[in-house]
């Protein structure tokens, strides 16, 4: 054999050795912090390897280095080795076939013997350290059987199941024999020996957030185990056996038997498992449905025996007793005694039942009285809260309704004073008292005007912030499963940047350096566009910086800073600089879109949008705007519509909860509900004549029909709740009362005759749906999602 052939054979031997190393390494569980086991075994046989030439040794060392480097896989590869360690087992016959294919040589045969001895020792040491572990997943009860080394820490087993279950390893716990195993412990520390079968449980410490579920794809997967088979007198061989979990029996399709060896060979069958035939239900048959009764008397047998004294037989009489007959009583006496006992039982039962009945009545009465007391307390509490709210609105007016309420109180006070003056004074004294009354009224009106100005400034700042929040809000979509999707566009991001700059400008208590930084940021932002507005803003910024450098006090710069903020807000409201704001401006950029929505106010002589006019359902033309109507009310009548607004809002909420596409109720305006309450129902309940508007509600007369002015009734809240529980109006009310209600409905239908025609034009109008959705009570459950921490 030539030297080249020897080198070639040695290289093939080393390569095959490396492959066998890799195959056998899948049986062991290499730990990253420890050295591979093959190194110790290899060092013991260095003397055998040194028999080769120097070139052969260098080549073998290079290959062994590569094999050692392959022993450092990641965690996933490590756990794959733990799960199926015996799928790639070492078979000496396979290597013997490979070695037999090569040309025999004395040196190569010696080297092969050394390699075989090393691998057999490694295989025995690894196989001896393995134990069969049955892992049970709690609470699903899934069982997974895997081989695992008894001297390997349990951290690798926990990491593997953490990867399969998608649960952090810190949440998983391993339990063996009722004890919780730690990560740095091994099975040997708990008395588990090699080749044993143990059962451990894996569960989650936080089942609500990280539940343990079944691992798909493992129940039907076959398992491979190694079985030791005796092949000779003192010879044993390990054979891999695959366990297939299937209850399907292969059908016998014929075959033949070898005459010499006696081995049976079956014909091939299909691997498709046939469909399971469903079990048929038990069917019972009977001849007829007629039941036959049979009455037979039968006397049961009773075996008895007697023992008499006799010669040779002794019977003890120590336990005998003398029985004497009692007093005889007839059947009538017996039945009379039973009847007397029954009467006694009935007497005591009826007494007990009467006590229970009276106790139930007493308890129901106490509950009823307690409920009535709570209702009275609730009404008193609501009245007190209404008075407190009234007092708070008088002293801290903020909305238009509050000032409307103040003017109403002023008019009520003026009427009382006027009546008192007319009754108490005459002539010159009356004129002097009227002049004094007029002066007081003027002072009160001036005070109300000052409060209105303060509230207007506060509301204006809040309106500006709400406007900026609306412009910078992201786009929101609601998915069918209840979740929301938010998306920011380049326009919303631009609007948010301008909003942040505006907030920084409006800050009060900041240092001079911080103010200079804000002005510098504003200057760079405004410089992007050149126009008259931006030029004026830049001049004001330079002026403020110059004054600050000269040491001007802050309170002297308030006017200049307010002017800068006002101009910058106009800058934000310009669609050229902030495109997102174009959707929320009252005056659109395209005049044609605004052409058909402008109306002329005959009072203030202004052209205003349609939203500035209050239109009743019975109106025939548009005459005056809202501001003119409110101004006329404050100057002349000074009426308060707050209670009517509450009544109308309660009607909106009630009709929105019906969800029957009612539209007439949402067409009713404040003037309509006022006319309906005052002129049709006389501002009082039909049943109890209660005239407290804060306690009255307007509900449907017939709850199966849509609400309308000719299908409503004015009742208190308690009466309305009882009215809506009626199943039939004819059974709940008298005929005279029903006739009275229908007469009022006819009056309302004549006055609101245009409402049905108006409702027919807005069947497909989306504004009604928006109003209904605004007052609809949201009862859908909130979905809270738990976000898992990253692995």
Curated annotation (Swiss-Prot):
Residues 338-367 form the IQ domain. The keyword Cytoplasm applies. It is linked to Defects in IQUB may be the cause of spermatogenic failure with radial spoke defects, leading to asthenospermia and male infertility. Sperm appear largely normal morphologically but with radial spoke defects, and their motility is severely reduced. Changing residue 735 to H: In a colorectal cancer sample; somatic mutation. The gene is IQUB. PROSITE patterns: UBIQUITIN_2. It holds the Pfam family ubiquitin. This is IQ motif and ubiquitin-like domain-containing protein. It is found in: Cytoplasm, Cytoskeleton, Flagellum axoneme; Cell projection, Cilium. It comes from the Eukaryota. Its main location: cytoplasm. Component of the axonemal radial spoke 1 (RS1) complex, at least composed of spoke head proteins RSPH1, RSPH3, RSPH9 and the cilia-specific component RSPH4A or sperm-specific component RSPH6A, spoke stalk proteins RSPH14, DNAJB13, DYDC1, ROPN1L and NME5, and the anchor protein IQUB. Does not appear to be part of radial spoke complexes 2 or 3 (RS2 or RS3). Interacts with CALM1. Interacts with DNAJB13. Interacts with DYNLL2. Interacts with NME5. Interacts with RSPH3. Interacts with RSPH9. Interacts with ZMYND10. Residues 131-207 form the Ubiquitin-like domain. It comes from Homo sapiens. Residues 1-73 are annotated as: Disordered.
